[in-house]
Regions:
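A glycine/proline-hinged amphipathic helix-loop "lid/cap" segment
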Residues: 1-72, 304, 308-309
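Short beta-strand-to-loop junctions in surface cap/lid or active-site-entrance loops
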Residues: 67-78, 229-234
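Short beta-strand element of the alpha/beta-hydrolase
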Residues: 78-87
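Catalytic nucleophile-loop/oxyanion-hole region of alpha/beta-hydrolase
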Residues: 95, 101-102, 114-148, 287-290
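Gly/Ala-rich beta-loop-alpha elbow adjacent to hydrolase catalytic centers
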Residues: 151, 155, 159
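Hydrolase active-site cap/lid region
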Residues: 164-219
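Short beta-strand/loop motif that positions the catalytic acidic residue
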Residues: 242-244
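Catalytic active-site module of serine/aspartate enzymes centered on a nucleophile-bearing elbow/loop
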Residues: 285-309
């Protein structure tokens, strides 16, 4: 991996992001990696004050997926809610660091967090990841609670697409969308950051592979929801918190999406994190990471409060 001026406050990024997930020769190793992630996740214990349930949920095509639900102990049925769309390039399942972040959000905001284990590529390209998350959003909407859409990396694509879907289908809108180093556009050559940081923590070759595998069924009439940057009109969407990392291939598309939202008169908080990289928040106890996480929490608190007054 090329050397970049990452903040000394952060651990260097790991090497797993340089794996070519589309290389069939690596398939056995990738399966072992996924099994290891799942084993680690199975040992996760929520902090005091929270409960964790894993439910099997029937989704759009009649199949079932797992959905983790974190919530305060003794919480009322109609708690404010977050739909957390996890990252992983559409190739990887929920990782333990994501559960730690979800638990922190649930505890500090006093909310219920849904973490769906949506189906992943290569076995399940579009529309499975988006439709699976849409099924969970519809469950939340029926509860008639304030809710947030949250997604990191590939999950940012899903969260942004769900916000567009809710607008276009006139269903209950989210109070806000929180997009953390999000994937938003498959037209990678449009962005200078793709060239500047092509070998950074989320390398260009993996980004290209991700889009190729995710969209290999075509867009199936879901164009704007699968690739949110292609939506011609962003008016009427929820307010947004967008957090690109300075040293990331995805930086410029996140900034461009924030500017488009602003042009559509959508309130946007854009936080470019200096010296940071894709997936930096995996080190959840790091003081630098915690400072950024608390910024997110305060913004999400504002989002929930703003629509409840």
């Amino acid at each position: 991996m090329a050397r970049y001026p990452y903040s000394p406050a952060l651990k260097p990024p790991g090497n797993w992001t340089s794996i070519d997930f589309a290389d069939p020769r690596l398939a056995p190793a990738i399966r072992l990696m996924i099994q290891g992630i799942q084993t680690d996740l199975s040992s996760f214990t929520p902090p005091d004050g929270l409960t964790l349930n894993r439910k099997q949920v029937t989704v759009w095509d009649g199949e079932t997926i797992s959905c983790y639900i974190l919530e305060p102990e003794g919480g009322c049925p109609k708690l404010p809610t977050m739909l957390y769309c996890h990252g992983g390039g559409f190739f990887l399942p929920i990782q333990t660091m994501m559960m730690h972040l979800a638990a922190q959000y649930a505890l500090e905001l006093g909310i219920r967090v849904y973490l769906p284990e949506y189906r992943i590529v290569p076995e399940h390209p579009n529309p499975y990841p988006f439709r699976d998350c849409l099924s969970i959003m519809e469950i939340i909407q029926k509860q008639d609670v304030h809710y947030l859409l949250y997604g990191e990396s590939a999950g940012g694509t899903l969260a942004a697409g769900l916000a567009l879907w809710a607008r276009d289908h006139n269903t209950k809108p989210a109070n806000g969308q929180c997009l953390i180093y999000p994937v938003l556009d498959n037209r990678c050559s449009r962005y200078a950051s793709m060239r500047l940081y092509s070998e950074a923590a989320w390398p260009l070759k993996n980004n290209l592979t991700m889009w190729r595998e995710y969209l290999k069924n075509g867009k199936m009439g879901l164009d704007d929801y699968l690739v949110p940057m292609t939506a011609p009109n962003l008016a009427g969407l929820p307010q947004a918190y967008i957090e690109p990392q300075q040293i990331d291939t995805l930086r410029d598309e996140a900034i461009a999406y924030a500017k488009r939202l602003e042009q559509a008169d959508i309130p946007v908080t854009l936080q470019v994190i200096e010296g940071s990289y894709h997936g930096f928040d995996a080190d959840t106890t790091n003081p630098f990471v915690q400072e950024i996480v608390h910024r997110r929490i305060e913004k999400m608190r504002e989002m929930l409060k703003g629509n409840s007054e």
